[in-house]
Amino acid sequence: MGSRKTALVKTRLMRALKRNREIPAWKRMMKEHKGEYNRARRHWRSKKLKIY
């Protein structure tokens, strides 16, 4: 990927990076959050972002 990106593309990539994390272990251990995980997780190779 080239380094010449617009500010809009950079912010969208940063946003996607933040959203691609799993739910913290301490939160999953709580009673209300049993069996909960991040369904929106994506792998960089299998699912591409539509930002361009």
Curated annotation (Swiss-Prot):
Disulfide bonds: none annotated. Keywords: Ribonucleoprotein, Ribosomal protein. GO terms for molecular function: structural constituent of ribosome. GO terms for cellular component: ribonucleoprotein complex; ribosome. One of its GO terms (biological process) is translation. Pfam families: Ribosomal_L39. It comes from the Eukaryota. The keyword Ribonucleoprotein applies. InterPro entries: Ribosomal_eL39 (IPR000077), Ribosomal_eL39_CS (IPR020083), Ribosomal_eL39_dom_sf (IPR023626). Belongs to the eukaryotic ribosomal protein eL39 family. Interacts with YIH1. This is Large ribosomal subunit protein eL39.
